[in-house]
C-alpha cells in the first residue's frame, strides 16, 4: 500500500492482447467459455503455452460438454491478429497440441458435496480485492490509464489508423502523488510492435498523437511529462516469436497494477469453483462497494480458504486509515452482508456463465462490462446499515 503522506511516484504497466502471455490467457479463457456454454458445472483448469509456430494446451477438465481445441485456439489467435507467417505465429499454420486430463478425484471429493451450498473451496489460498477513489471506476490511476493506453494501441492497429502496427505491445504510466492523491503524469512508456521498415521518428509521433494524447487526461500532462516510445529503436520481432507466453503470468496487470496486495493466484482458464478467481472477484466486489458507500477512500479485502472447506478461514476488510469506521467494524459488516462460501459467491455474481474471454486482457477489474458483475455497487445500502451509518 502506498503512503498517504508526502510526494512520491507510482507506476503500473499494461499489455495488449497480442502480448504472448495474454495470447495464452485468452486461449485458456476461450476454452473455458466454450465449455461453460454447454456445462455450467464443469471443472476447468486450462493452461496454455505459446511459442514460435506452436500453441500447447494442458490441464484438467471434467465436463459433459465438448470443446474443439484446434478451432478455438486458431480462432482466438486470428482475432488477436497473428495471421501472417512472417510474424512467426500464424493462426492457420501453427501447431496446436493438447494434453487434457480429468480433474483429480482427490480435489473433486473436496469440492463436490451432496448440496451445492456446502461446496468446498477448490484450493487453499488467500485472495485480495482493492478499490479507491482515484478514478471513476474506483481503480488506481496508474493501472487504469495504462489499460486505456493498451486498448487504444490495439484500436488504432485494428482500425488501420496506424496500419503498420503489429499485435504485441506494452504500456506503462507513472503518476506523481501528493499526500495520497495522483496529481500529474510523470512518465509514459510504450513498446509497440511494428512492421519492418518504419522509421522510429514516425512511430514516435504517430503513437504520441493517436494513443498517448488521445487516451490520457490533458490536465494530468505537463511540459515535464516524459514520453518514451520504442526505446530500443526497433520492435519487429514480437508476440510468441519474441517471447514464450504462458497463462497466468500477468497477474499484476490483471488486478491493480501493484497497488495493494496480491494472493498470487492467476485467473484465466479457471472455472468459478477455483477461489483463486471467484474469491478475488468477490473481494473486488466487496472493496468497491465499501468505497462506493463512502465508508472509506481506499479499501482492501482479504479472504482465505482451505481446500474442501466452504467457509473462509479468515476475512479482513481494511481502509488503511481512510475509513469512516474502524477496520474491526468494517470486517464485521462484510461478514454480515456477504456470504463468502464458494457456491454463494458464484450465485451472487452469476459466475457459472461463458463470460471470461473479455476479462483475459486489459484487466479483470474497473471495466464497464455488464457481464462483470463484480463491478456492481448494489451492496452500498446494506454495508452502511451494517456499519450503523
Swiss-Prot record:
UniProt binding sites for Mg(2+): 21
InterPro entries in alphabetical order: ADOMET_SYNTHASE_CS, S-AdoMet_synt_C, S-AdoMet_synt_central, S-AdoMet_synt_N, S-AdoMet_synthetase, S-AdoMet_synthetase_sfam
Catalytic reactions on record: L-methionine + ATP + H2O = S-adenosyl-L-methionine + phosphate + diphosphate
GO terms under cellular component: cytoplasm
Span list, region Flexible loop: 103-113
Main location: cytoplasm
GO BP terms in the entry: one-carbon metabolic process; S-adenosylmethionine biosynthetic process
EC number(s) per entry: 2.5.1.6
Pathway in which this enzyme or protein is active: Amino-acid biosynthesis; S-adenosyl-L-methionine biosynthesis; S-adenosyl-L-methionine from L-methionine: step 1/1
Binding site for K(+): 47
Residues the entry annotates as binding L-methionine: 60, 103, 243, 274
Cofactor requirements of the protein: Mg(2+); K(+)
Cofactor details (free text): Binds 2 divalent ions per subunit. Binds 1 potassium ion per subunit.
Record key words, sorted: ATP-binding, Cytoplasm, Magnesium, Metal-binding, Nucleotide-binding, One-carbon metabolism, Potassium, Transferase
Binding site for ATP: 19, 168-170, 234-235, 243, 249-250, 266, 270
CDD domains (alphabetical): S-AdoMet_synt
Localisation per UniProt entry: Cytoplasm
Domain of life: Bacteria
GO molecular function: ATP binding; magnesium ion binding; methionine adenosyltransferase activity
Record text on subunit structure and interactions: Homotetramer; dimer of dimers.
Family classification: Belongs to the AdoMet synthase family.
PANTHER family hit by this protein: S-ADENOSYLMETHIONINE SYNTHETASE
Function: Catalyzes the formation of S-adenosylmethionine (AdoMet) from methionine and ATP. The overall synthetic reaction is composed of two sequential steps, AdoMet formation and the subsequent tripolyphosphate hydrolysis which occurs prior to release of AdoMet from the enzyme.
Entry protein name: S-adenosylmethionine synthase
Gene encoding the protein: metK
Amino acid at each position: 500500500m502506498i503512503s498517504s503522506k508526502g510526494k512520491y511516484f507510482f507506476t503500473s504497466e499494461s499489455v495488449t492482447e497480442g502480448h504472448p502471455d495474454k495470447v495464452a490467457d485468452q486461449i485458456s479463457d476461450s476454452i473455458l467459455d466454450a465449455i461453460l456454454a454447454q456445462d455450467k458445472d464443469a471443472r476447468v483448469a486450462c493452461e496454455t503455452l505459446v511459442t514460435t509456430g506452436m500453441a500447447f494446451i494442458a490441464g484438467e477438465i471434467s465436463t459433459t460438454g465438448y470443446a474443439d481445441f484446434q478451432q478455438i485456439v486458431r480462432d482466438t489467435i486470428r482475432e488477436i491478429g497473428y495471421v501472417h507467417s512472417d510474424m512467426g505465429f500464424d493462426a492457420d499454420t501453427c501447431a496446436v497440441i493438447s494434453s487434457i486430463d480429468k480433474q483429480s478425484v482427490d480435489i473433486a471429493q473436496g469440492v463436490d458435496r451432496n448440496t451445492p451450498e456446502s461446496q468446498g473451496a477448490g484450493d487453499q489460498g488467500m485472495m485480495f480485492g482493492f478499490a479507491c477513489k482515484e478514478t471513476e471506476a474506483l481503480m488506481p490511476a496508474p493501472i487504469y490509464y495504462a489499460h486505456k493506453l493498451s486498448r487504444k494501441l490495439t484500436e488504432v492497429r485494428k482500425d488501420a489508423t496506424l496500419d503498420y502496427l503489429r499485435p504485441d505491445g506494452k504500456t506503462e504510466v507513472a503518476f506523481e502523488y501528493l499526500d495520497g492523491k495522483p496529481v500529474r503524469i510523470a512518465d509514459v512508456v510504450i513498446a509497440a510492435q511494428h512492421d519492418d521498415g518504419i522509421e522510429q521518428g514516425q512511430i514516435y509521433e504517430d503513437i504520441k498523437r493517436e494513443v498517448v494524447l488521445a487516451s490520457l487526461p490533458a490536465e494530468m500532462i505537463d511540459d515535464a511529462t516524459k514520453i518514451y516510445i520504442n526505446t530500443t529503436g526497433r520492435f519487429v520481432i514480437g508476440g510468441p516469436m519474441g517471447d514464450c507466453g504462458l497463462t497466468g503470468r500477468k497477474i499484476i496487470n490483471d488486478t491493480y497494477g501493484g497497488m495493494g496486495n496480491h494472493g498470487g493466484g492467476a485467473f484465466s482458464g479457471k472455472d468459478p469453483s477455483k477461489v483463486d478467481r471467484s474469491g478475488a472477484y468477490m473481494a473486488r466486489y466487496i472493496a468497491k462497494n465499501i468505497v462506493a458507500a463512502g465508508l472509506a477512500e481506499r479499501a482492501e479485502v482479504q479472504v482465505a480458504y482451505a481446500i474442501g472447506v466452504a467457509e473462509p478461514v479468515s476475512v479482513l476488510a481494511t481502509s488503511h486509515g481512510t475509513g469512516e469506521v474502524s477496520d474491526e467494524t468494517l470486517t464485521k459488516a462484510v461478514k454480515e452482508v456477504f456470504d463468502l462460501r464458494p457456491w454463494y459467491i458464484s450465485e451472487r455474481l452469476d459466475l457459472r456463465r461463458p463470460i471470461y474471454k473479455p476479462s483475459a486482457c486489459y484487466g479483470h477489474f474497473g471495466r464497464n462490462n455488464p457481464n462483470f458483475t463484480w463491478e456492481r455497487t448494489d451492496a452500498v445500502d446494506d454495508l452502511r446499515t451494517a456499519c450503523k451509518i
